[in-house]
């Protein structure tokens, strides 16, 4: 199963370390049956968000901590070059990078907490779900997996 995690899910996993986002992040990095599909743009956005002063101070991170964790994530995921330029999310066009990353990486699922992306529900055969829904799918043994051709 190939998953693309939205930046908000990754931020939640980094900060909370508990809950659906953190559990999903851990599974995506350790389960052999799950491949995590990201792009450099998503990783840069993650690093930018986590190194904002208000985030670092509130959660006691240093720039070095963030870089180390993002680099570890980079090494344990499939980084795809994003060539697609689909424009789908009219309310927030910045969200299109997640759809394009998932499409170019042939992901089966996009996992997001973003209301604009969740409204899409399905994109080019890729289901858009929230972290709880994804954990439910995984716990059911991937029975909801729909492969794209």
What residue ranges belong to the model's regions?
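Residues that scaffold the ATP/ADP-binding catalytic core of kinase and kinase-like folds
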Residues: 13-14, 49, 58, 120, ...
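Short, well-structured N-terminal submotif of metal-dependent ribonuclease cores
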Residues: 1-38
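PIN-domain endoribonuclease scaffold, especially VapC-family toxins
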Residues: 28-85
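Acidic, PIN/NYN-like endoribonuclease modules and their adjacent C-terminal/linker elements
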Residues: 105-109, 115-149
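Active-site neighborhoods of divalent-metal-dependent phosphate/nucleic-acid chemistry enzymes
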Residues: 75-109
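A generic structural signal for short hydrophobic patches within well-formed alpha-helices
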Residues: 10, 43, 55, 117, ...
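A secondary-structure boundary/capping signal
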Residues: 6-7, 38-39, 113-114, 130
């Amino acid at each position: 199963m190939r998953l693309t995690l939205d930046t908000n899910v990754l931020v939640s996993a980094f900060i909370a370390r508990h809950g659906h986002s953190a559990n999903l992040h851990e599974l995506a990095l350790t389960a052999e049956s799950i491949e995590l599909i990201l792009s450099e743009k998503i990783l840069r956005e993650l690093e930018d968000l986590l190194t904002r002063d208000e985030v670092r101070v509130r959660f006691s991170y240093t720039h070095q901590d963030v870089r180390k964790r993002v680099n570890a994530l980079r090494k344990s995921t499939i980084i795809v070059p994003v060539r697609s330029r689909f424009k789908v999310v009219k309310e927030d066009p910045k969200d299109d990078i997640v759809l394009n990353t998932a499409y170019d990486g042939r992901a089966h699922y996009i996992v997001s907490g973003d209301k604009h992306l969740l409204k899409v529900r399905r994109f080019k055969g890729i289901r858009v779900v929230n972290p709880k829904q994804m954990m439910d799918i995984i716990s059911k043994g991937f029975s909801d997996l729909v492969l794209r051709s």
